[in-house]
């Protein structure tokens, strides 16, 4: 069993693959938030040669590339394990190399991303501006009003051009209801709560 099957390494590689996928997702999300101006990434090198002042997301792009490499290594580990012959896995050297490389890369990328993330600044004004202009905030009213009523509100809001979403909702539902529903405590709470 010890020389015939390498499935324990495939399992470990699968866990590393899942970690890589999460690092890719987080890094992509941070890149998008930076592009939208909702966060400011720390500069780590000279910016764009054609756009003065631009901060390139090089750390995030580096972490994404590590994730892609770890995913590729996962395929190598699986293929090497599958190609063992009877009682021996002849491809163990390549399997081990890919697995150990993935571990080293993930340790380095996780540390790099963690240190980088601590220096990210939130552009609060931009976030609030985008939130105020987004009819998607009507989603927060689904537990109170139901999906169909919220869909009607979105359609009605989109037919007018004079008011912000919040002003529109206050006219439709009342200021107290809007303030309570859109309060940070309510928005950040888990699940839906029934009102007494």
Locate the predicted segments by residue.
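Conserved, well-structured ligand/cofactor-binding cores
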Residues: 1-196
């Amino acid at each position: 069993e010890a020389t015939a099957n390498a499935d324990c390494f495939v399992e470990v590689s699968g866990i590393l693959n899942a970690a890589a996928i999460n690092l890719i997702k987080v890094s992509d999300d941070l890149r998008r938030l930076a592009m939208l101006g909702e966060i400011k990434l720390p500069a780590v090198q000279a910016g764009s040669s054609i756009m003065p002042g631009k901060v390139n997301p090089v750390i995030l792009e580096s972490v994404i590339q590590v994730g892609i490499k770890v995913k590729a290594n996962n395929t190598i580990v699986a293929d090497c394990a599958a190609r063992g012959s009877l009682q021996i896995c002849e491809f163990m050297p390549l399997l081990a190399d890919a697995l150990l490389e993935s571990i080293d890369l993930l340790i380095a990328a996780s540390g790099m991303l963690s240190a980088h993330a601590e220096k990210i600044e939130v552009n609060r004004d931009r976030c609030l501006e985008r939130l105020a202009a987004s009819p998607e905030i009507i989603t927060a009213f689904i537990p109170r009003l139901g999906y169909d009523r919220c869909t009607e509100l979105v359609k009605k809001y989109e037919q007018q051009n004079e008011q912000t979403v919040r002003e529109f909702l206050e006219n439709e539902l009342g200021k107290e209801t809007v303030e309570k529903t859109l309060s940070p405590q309510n928005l950040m709470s888990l699940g839906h709560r029934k009102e007494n």
